[in-house]
């Protein structure tokens, strides 16, 4: 069993219209939401074995505010392939993870994260897949338990969404 944490970056700022998409920072609301998610991770003792993060400014800032929750010892890799990647690209990257890792967190962007979550998750009765399909807002975390022993075996329908937490669920939006 492998556990995958898919975290969409928190709300970004559109104040400076001259910035490239890659360079947009978090908004005030986004900073608060990312901090609240870090506290949620700490409360629930969610500590991934590895973090793969888009190098975009808003994803890096989101991760910085989570680090109190997951701790500084978690290895983090900033990978350009995660920036604005589609689901097949993200899946290919995850399949290359070291099998000694029981869990991994992907901090990235939509629509790729949402598409990946929906592809990996089989239909389920708990309603979380339907909730996520309706909207995977900024600052949200989807937890997927994949019924595989090796990351290379990740494929559509191999997992189930065991938790879906939005910033608004934490009182941060």
Can you describe what each PLM-predicted range is?
Residues 44-46, 97-102:
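Glycine-rich phosphate-binding loop signature in dinucleotide/nucleotide-binding domains
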Residues 102-121:
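A glycine-rich beta-strand to alpha-helix segment
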Residues 157-173:
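Charged phosphate-binding loop/patch that engages nucleotide di/tri-phosphates or the phosphate backbone
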Residues 56-60, 110-111, 138:
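Alpha-helix N-cap/helix-start capping motif
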Residues 4, 103-105, 141:
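Residue-level preference for the first positions of well-ordered beta-strands
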Residues 2-81, 85, 89, 125-126, ...:
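Active-site-proximal alpha-helix that buttresses catalytic centers in soluble enzyme cores
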Residues 121-162:
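Domain-level recognition of soluble alpha/beta enzyme cores
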Residues 91-97:
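Short, surface-exposed amphipathic charged segments that create phosphate/polyanion-binding patches used
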